[in-house]
Amino acid sequence: MPGGYKGECGDDVDPMPFLAPPEKERIEAMNKPYDIKKSCWVKDEKEGFIAGEIQSEQGDQVTVKTVNNQTVTVKKDDVQQMNPPKFYQASDMADMTFLNEASVLNNLRQRYTNMRIYTYSGLFCVTVNPYKWLPIYGARVANMYKGKKRTEMPPHLFSISDNAYHDMLMNRENQSMLITGESGAGKTENTKKVIQYFANVGGTGKQSSDGKGQGSLEDQIIQANPVLEAFGNAKTIRNNNSSRFGKFIRIHFGTTGKLAGADIESYLLEKSRVISQQAAERGYHIFYQILSNKKPELIESLLLVPNPKEYHWVSQGVTVVENMDDGEELQITDVAFDVLGFSAEEKIGIYKLTGGIMHFGNMKFKQKPREEQAEVDTTEVADKVSHLMGLNSGELQKGITRPRVKVGNEFVQKGQNVEQCNNSIGALGKAIYDKMFKWLVVRINKTLDTKMQRQFFIGVLDIAGFEIFEFNSFEQLCINFTNEKLQQFFNHHMFVLEQEEYKREGIEWVFIDFGLDLQACIDLLEKPMGIFSILEEQCVFPKATDATFKAALYDNHLGKSNNFLKPKGGKGKGPEAHFELVHYAGTVAYNITGWLEKNKDPLNETVVGLFQKSSLGLLALLFKEEEAPAGSKKQKRGSSFMTVSNFYREQLNKLMATLHSTAPHFVRCIVPNEFKQSGVVDAHLIMHQLACNGVLEGIRICRKGFPNRMQYPEFKQRYQVLNPNVIPQGFVDNKKASELLLGSIDLDVNEYKIGHTKVFFRAGILAKLEDMRDERLAKIMTMLQCRLRGFLMRIEFKKMLERRIGLKVIQRNTRKFLELRFWGWWKLYNKVKPLLNVARQEEEMKAKEEELRNAMSKTQELLSRVKELEEKMATLSQEKNDLTIQLQAEQENVIDAEERLTQMMKTKMDLESQISDMRERLEEEEGTAASLSATKRKLEGEMSDLKRDLEGLETTLAKTEKEKQALDHRVRTLTGDLSLREDSIAKLQKEKRALEELHQKTLDDLQAEEDKVNHLTKTNSKLSTQIHELEDNWEQEKKIRAEVEKARRKAESDLKMTIDNLNDMERSKLDLEEVVKKRDMEINSVNSKYEDEQSLNSTLQRKLKEHQARIEELEEELEAERSMRAKVEKQRSDLSRDLEDLSDRLEEAGGATSAQIEQNRKREAELLKLRRELEEAALQSEAAASTLRKKHTDSMAELTEHVENLQRVKSKLEKDKQVMKAEIDDLNASMETVQKSKMNAEAHIRKLEDSLSEANAKVAELERNQAEINAVRTRLQAENGELSREYEESQSRLNQILRIKTSLTSQVDDYKRQLDEESKSRSAAMVSLANTKHDLDLVKEQLEEEQGGKSELQRLVSKLNTEVTTWRTKYETDAIQRTEELEETKRKLAARLQEAEETAEAAQARAASLEKNKQRLQAEVEDLTIDLEKANAAAAALDKKQRVFDKMLAEWQQKCEELQVEVDSSQKECRMYMTESFKIKTAYEESLEHLESVKKENKTLQEEIKELIDQLGEGGRSVHELQKLKKKLEIEKEELQVALEEAESSLEVEESKVIRIQLELAQVKADIDRRIHEKEEEFEATRKNHQRAIESLQASLEAEAKGRAEALRLKKKMETDLNEMEIQLDHANKNNSELVKTLKRLQQQIKDLQVQMDEDARQHEELREQYNLQERRLSLLQTELEEVRSGLEGSERSRKLLEQEVVEITERHNEVNIQNQSLLVVKRKLESDVQRISSEHEELISEFRSADERAKKAMTDAARMAEELRQEQDHCMHLEKIKKNYEITIKDLQAKMEEAEQLALKGGKRTIMKLEARIKELETELDGEQKQHVETVKTLRKNERRLKELVFQTEEDHKTNQRMQELVEKLQNKLKVYKRQIEEAEEQANQTLARYRKTVHELDDAEERAGMAETALNKLRTRHRVAGKGITSV
């Protein structure tokens, strides 16, 4: 299925024939003859299996007649049963009766020949490549499958996709679709269809967020495929559109299932295809698309010709693909670029790089004559490449032919031959294409990242299929390894995890081993010492080749692994195979040629550098990251470079982890034949793929197992409808309920299993349950429809009955009218009756019209009020939406800040790790350099000693030769003179022979010594060269260290700037969680630093151990050297003894000469000298060893001290972390309360909206009532009353809405105020955090400076020691070798002694100045002691006054507590009265409602009375009774009026009181706010004072550091001058010792002063604690009375004075007296403040009493109102009695009405007129009474409203008091924080004092070391004198 989307739109073609067989075809198949016992399948070589019919059976042999009329005899095991015809083209092969290979193959073959390519196979889907377009992928088919179950539609890829989409939404879990199969099986096309389906299902239809006219997100997701196919797909032997890379496409969805973005991960692009292809294959499509000449302007701009044969790299195989138009594909690719938002510059860059790669392949090189150097044949191609890639042509050619290579520390140009140049450009072309492809993927991901909220994703995997070619290389191994892992994942998921879940859930199950474990092959590839591991190892070896790689593979795996085979020989054609691997899909022979280079992937660094400077932006962007890895490789010690296989395996492991975290859906693609012909089936090929993919095993486990499962709650909820009666009412366990439900359904027990948490079903059972559920729901809906239709018909029948009754009444009245129409009286009645009602009707009409107008105006007002409320609700909802939008924006900003912070912290940690690594390496190099320099010096000394020994031996040899000649001459003279003494001559001859032997022996020894000396010189030269190299490396490391130090400083400065910016941002965002996260990150970083320090400590210890071992080795060498020297000395002693014997013999012979004696003396002197030198060398080695041990101990002590400091910092940070966690918990609790209140407010708003909707409905009802008033005149009054009642209800609701609105606005204001307070506290916390960080940084810097100074001192001391030793050795050697230089040395020493005298005089002057300082300090100490005594006396007096003040404060506190108790009791009484008032109010409301009902009844009775009066003729008595009733009503009305006026007056009084209280509360609140603001300003001033104090401390520390630096400088000067102090050193030592004593005495005095200072500080601390106690007590008074501002100001001023005193104590010791005096002043101020506070407290008590009296008065008023309400209730009861009397009178009137009907005809007009006039008067009076009654009701409601407002106001006041208390508590917390900061500052001051003492001790140590150096110089002087005497004696 090659690329593109054409031909798939089959909306005008019926797709069903391509999905499922038609009914006619199915019926024809079912009618075919079939015998279950005879129909079978037998094997066939061509068809795989062929149908047949069993003829006979004989034992194990079966005779079968095939459909080809052939009779065959086969074994019974080779015969497979045939399925019944009803399974013709089964959609799910798991449903077949007989599951065997023949049935599966036949089913797939039948469906494929009919182009039904999709078939279910249990839980997954099998698809066969049709090799042509089918109309089954259009929008029509997609809509058919959308939202459908799997069983409802024929098999299709869309069904699997829709199930994955449904599972994602239902199970809330990520999904993945694994589309696997061999190469050419159709994976890429199926992947495109899946992505297209998901894009359509979850499409939003929105344009991209860029606003550049791009397509929607779904269009961009779909259009990503053409770009990736153009650059990543190519033609292979088995597939015209083969993906030569792997991709995993994640399609992200939001919570509603809509698309939210996508991203793509690519795996292992086949780079080698860029430069080489096999014969029947082609390169990547993009090359041929560009060369198709569809865009001539593109060809022209890229300098190309439209013929692929002109370009070597793309024309090694075929250049045209059948059924693929490259020009059309180029247009599709270009359009896809536009849809994906690629800019024109990016497109041109991509095309230029692609064209440049094609030109790159045409570069030719030739060999220079008589040189191993290649050169470019023609520069035309290079010029084209340079033009397209933005390079310099000459530099490009030079970089390819003569690249720069680093050799040691220098770069040299290396010549390249032709083959190397071709390999270089090939590697560059592959690298450009690979990086461009990766950049394309990143760029597409950037477009598809929409920044929308992502909830879940569905991943679609498309990996290159399993490949078996004639030539299989490294790429095929990686592809096949990936497929092996995916097949193992499938097997593990389908067969292992499934059965493990059965066991886990407790289902009876026998584990089945399907034999599909591929772990052996995977282990062979990826485990340690596997193929990939060996490949990595060989890449590291410098001289590894393909042969060594092959040998390593054979040694490790041949014969040891069944999956590793040696290739079979004898093919004779094709490339050579080096080894074979047994994969799940077959055995593959691999050729390992070039694997090492492919894995290392080397590049020409010179050309890469040119690429980085390219003018083509895209090329420079692709290679700019080449610099970073180089640096990182240098910085990562011991880490190997990242190879291709290593990188690919990391990617694959991440992919497998992603797949394990998702729910997989498998689609297995099948290749039908190897000829790419549609409809042709290769049975053996298909069966091989089915066996390899585990299709049959998957069907078996699906049939045997329980593939479907559900959780018990879900099963109960979904299927309870099948039998709801079986589950009892009440609580029932879900598992028990499911068991009962399953037991009541007609299901076999074997068809399901009950697990611990789930119920499991066999295949198809869940679909059966779904069908049963659908049937049950259909029945329920049918029954419901029946009931509803019956109900509606009954209503219609009632209406019909009512109409029938109405018709009968009309008919009866008509008949009566026809009977009476001619009766005279009836005619008279008809004439008179209208005349009677004319006048009254006109008045009634006017009255009604007036009432109607009033009602209409009221309704208009009501409508306007409703509109206003709607507008207010709209504004409130708009404000709410704005707040939510602001909150979301703030949250997004916080998330962005967190991400930026995490990135910055990561970069910071990386930089710190790099810096620590560089420091470690630098320290190692310094240590090695130091050790090598020490060994160098030692070897130089030994070499000089050996040279001297050699010179001495040479002189000795010359002397012995001279002596030998003299002896020979002597013998000859003696033989001539003493010829008669032959015996003596013979004796002398013997002695001569002995001397010759001895001489020969000495010569041999000398030769051995010369050889040894030569060997030592050689080793010395080697060591010197190594030392030079190490020195060069050390210099380079110094440079690197300097660069790293600069980078570190820059990074630190950048980091500080970014941290400051982040702090500013955090202060503006009002979010405290950021601070907590930042603190956590800092703690983690400190922990990581602590771990790094621990690792550094361990490495240093390890290195120290190594140095100790090295020292031991050197000591062993020294011992060996000593033993060798002892041997030489022994030989020399033997030689001297022999010489002595010889001299004795010569004396016996003729006496020794004076020369021989002198020579013996010289030899003895030389021997003594050698012994002395050996002893000195031993002393030197021991001194060196002792210095090394001392350094080791010092370094260990420093490290332990550093570790302890880090531990202290860690503990402090952990405490801070705990504090911040507690603050976070508090903030979370407050946020929860805020959220709860917000939810309550939203609930109130919803209630208000409901009430508004009800009000709207009632307004509509009012309008209908008005319409009915016009229609029905008789019911006008009743409905008018109803309208007024509803109006009043709506008015009350409206008032209630307004009150709720005010409460909501007040809550919003409270929330805003709380938010402001939180922001202020957060900003204060941030400021304090920044201050502490700054202090910590300062302390760290000081500590580092001190450590640096200490190390500098140690280095100087060691340097002085080495200089002393070098001078000593040099002086001794010079004294021994040359006597002439001694005089010059003496002169130099005299000059230096003169200088030393000058320095000694300077030291004496300095000592005198120190003596003066001592005297001055002693005077200051005496003054300080006097001041201390005065301060102690003042402190004692202050203590006494403080105790008195404490007693006064305790008394006031007791009084305040009593007042608090009284206030609490009054508040309790107030609450009790409030509850009683609420009860009275509710009773009053009930009485009002009752009164309204009575009024309504009264109105109805009045109307009835009017009607009766109209009909009465003689109604005198009734008129009299009505007059009585009227009088009664008037009396009651007057009583009510009086009561209402009294209540109104009392309410007005209460209202004035409430207003006055509100004014007072507002004034108190303003005072409190003002005081809080002043307190905050005071706290800010305090903080600034603290900051100034800390800065002054810092300044003093800096001054102290400068003084220490000055002392160090002077000390260095003294140490440099020590070498010149030789003559007057004794005098200087004496002065120095006196100075040391003086310093010690001064230090002791300073220590005593320090003790006194500590005691004074302790006393001040006690005073400060007492003042803190006063402040706490005063703060308690402030919480209750809020009037103690002046006292707090005084205490704050005193606290400031105390802090200034602490600072002054650390700087100067002579200001204690001034501080004590200031304390006395503060004490007096405090006493005056306390008196003022007491007076103010009394005033506040009086105010509280007056407020209490006012509250009691309000309570009495409330009681009076309650009494009035009781009276009103009694009045209502009285009205109830009147109502009952009215009912009695109504009954009487009804009786009288019957009589009046008889008398009505008898009465005259005159009585009727009188009665009518009387009735009118009564009606007018009644109307007046009603109006007065309405006004009284209004006044009552008004009073009630005022009462509610008063209650609400009191509640608000109570809330404000609570808020003020909370504010005071927060202020107290702030005070505590500030006090804690003061304590920390004091701790820092103490630490600085401790450091000062420490520096004094170090100065003492330095002076002691100087004394030791001076004693050493004295010893040296004495030795020099002894040597001088010896020289003078010589």
From Swiss-Prot:
SUPFAM superfamilies the UniProt entry points to: Myosin rod fragments (SSF90257), P-loop containing nucleoside triphosphate hydrolases (SSF52540), Tropomyosin (SSF57997)
Protein name: Myosin-16
GO MF, one annotated term: actin filament binding
Species name: Canis lupus familiaris (Dog)
Gene3D superfamilies cross-referenced by the UniProt entry: 1.10.10.820, 1.20.5.340, 1.20.5.370, 1.20.5.4820, 1.20.58.530, Kinesin motor domain, Myosin S1 fragment, N-terminal, Myosin VI head, motor domain, U50 subdomain
Domain of life according to the entry: Eukaryota
Domain IQ per the UniProt entry, residue ranges: 777-806
Function: May play a role in masticatory muscles contraction.
